[in-house]
Amino acid sequence: MTDMNDHVVVIGAGHNGLVCAAYLARAGRNVTVVEAAEHPGGAAITREFAPGFKVSAAAHLLYMLDENVRKDLSLDTAGLSFSQQDMKTTALAEDGNHLLMSKNAVQGANISSEDQAAMQEYRRLMGRFARLLHRLNNRIPPRVGSGNRDDMIGLAKTALDIRMLGRQDMREIMRMAGINMYDILQEYFENPLLKGALSMDGVLGAKLGPRSNNSVFCALHRLSGMQGTALPAGGMGTVSNALANAAQKLGVKIRTSAAVTRVLLQGDRVCGVELEDGERIAAGMVVSS
């Protein structure tokens, strides 16, 4: 195993690992991604289940592709396109009076004027909190108590952002953060289809239910993507393929069928990884995605 202190190994070629690897390479690091599967993508893959028919095998909708990532990595030229954006949610009713929920309107299902008004306030509040979370997600988390100037500025910005919500909304976000989607939706709405559609959008793919703790935060996290719901042309595999293409263009080496069995240490520092076949890859940094 040769000395490669400037080398970074990223474990896992899912979308998070590929984005991480691409940004590290963009910053001038020498990066290798190791993936146990035969292809990159993780849960964002497209599979052919019958000759000529393909489907997204796990994740099937794109919620949170940050526009900065899309631009920084030139994903549009790397193969990413969409067959549909700003998708609507439909909640089916037994009597055929289905509910149709778009970004700006709710129709059908005998929605009352009270629920329509409540929906406007709900969207205003959740949208405001999501925009706050979006700003926080795009900052380097400040280290509390470090005394570092940048950390102190980061903490001040975070405190100011929360304070700028105003007293009422600030109290409301503190309250909502500790309860669940079910309780919030019960407070705001009467229509069961509307509550079902909103709770599904909030917890889909999160291994949570509407009554689970932190399910409100999960919904806010999804809304903080700020781009709405999109359907990639060719399935979710095209997202991973575009990320892999962008990463490789930046010099990232992607190795598939390369399962990591352990992270290697030298004293109290990481020095590489060992693969299933016994091969060792030296690295000054290891990122597990």
Task: Go through each PLM region and give its residues.
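Flavin (primarily FAD) binding-site architecture
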Residues: S288-S289
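Alpha-helix capping and helix-loop boundary segments enriched in small/acidic/polar residues
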Residues: G12, S56-A57, K207, R211, ...
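Core beta-strand elements of the Rossmann-like FAD/NAD(P) dinucleotide-binding domain
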Residues: M4-D6, L275-M285
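Rossmann-like flavin
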Residues: E94-S212
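N-terminal glycine-rich phosphate/pyrophosphate-binding loop and immediately adjacent elements
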Residues: D3-G145
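Helical element adjacent to the flavin cofactor pocket in flavoenzyme catalytic cores
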Residues: C218-V270, E274
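Short acidic/polar mixed-charge low-complexity motifs
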Residues: F53, D95-N97, R269, D277-R280
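Generic recognition of stable, solvent-exposed alpha-helical segments in well-folded globular domains
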Residues: A13, V19, E121, M176, ...
